[in-house]
Amino acid sequence: MQRLPRTVPLKQAMGMMLTGRRVGAQEGLKLGFVTAMVPHAKLMEEARRWAGLILECSPMSVRATKQAVMRSLDATSLQEAMNNLSYPAYAAMAKGEDAIEGPKAFAEKRKPDWKGR
């Protein structure tokens, strides 16, 4: 309940929450809380595509992003969320081997070899 008004326009969020109205996938896509819509037969293919895209990223970067996003949802304002620098996963990522590997791979025009450390 606390997250929906941060995801979709307030009036739409209130309408859904106060009435319990069900929202279909197409409307969810339009409102922005559905990422993609595919036929049922293509569901696993699309899920694997998304997983592949995520797996191409540094595991430490994915972890830090998830931590920052989830913790920022608890902030009372955008400013508070932006000022909160106490994300342990981000600090670990910034000091890790992958922080060196990413720019190095980019400069060498090759795919990074993420170590997750």
Where are these regions (language model features)?
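Terminal peptide-recognition signature
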Residues: L4, G28, T65, F106
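C-terminal long alpha-helix characteristic of the crotonase
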Residues: A25, V34-A81, W114-R117
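Helix-capping/helix-break motifs at membrane-protein junctions
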Residues: P9, P39-H40, K95
